[in-house]
Amino acid sequence: MKVTLIAILTCAAVLVLHTTAAEELEAESQLMEVGMPDTELAAVDEERLFECSASCEIEKEGNKDCKKKKCKGGWKCKFNMCVKV
């Protein structure tokens, strides 16, 4: 009886580990397929930098600090630029 229980638990543990590893591999392969080329990422970075610095300059003319929430998607406004958090 103990041997059967140990065998069942071992099999269940192996199944869980195998499933987790398979999900990780699938997620990695999807990330690699969906990723943007470096040139497109650079264009997005430049656009965010421009938007943030322009909005910060407008805010500063009114003697206000740069709005931190102006940059989105893991970016924040710092020194009149959008920087990756």
From Swiss-Prot:
Record propeptide residues: 23-48
**Chief location of this protein within or outside the cell:** secreted
Q: Which InterPro entries match?
A: Hwtx-2-like
Keyword tags: Disulfide bond, Neurotoxin, Postsynaptic neurotoxin, Secreted, Signal, Toxin
Q: According to the UniProt entry, where is the signal peptide?
A: 1-22
Hydrolase as a keyword of this entry, yes or no, is: no
Q: Is-annotated flag, keyword Repressor?
A: no
Under what name is this protein listed? U4-theraphotoxin-Hhn1c
GO MF annotation list: toxin activity
- What pairs make up the disulfide bonds? C52-C66, C56-C77, C71-C82
Compartment annotation:
Secreted
SUPFAM superfamilies (alphabetical): omega toxin-like
Its GO CC terms are: extracellular region; host cell postsynaptic membrane
What species was this sequence derived from?
Cyriopagopus hainanus
Summarize tissue expression. Expressed by the venom gland.
The family assignment reads: Belongs to the neurotoxin 12 (Hwtx-2) family. 02 (Hwtx-2) subfamily.
Report the protein's function: Postsynaptic neurotoxin.
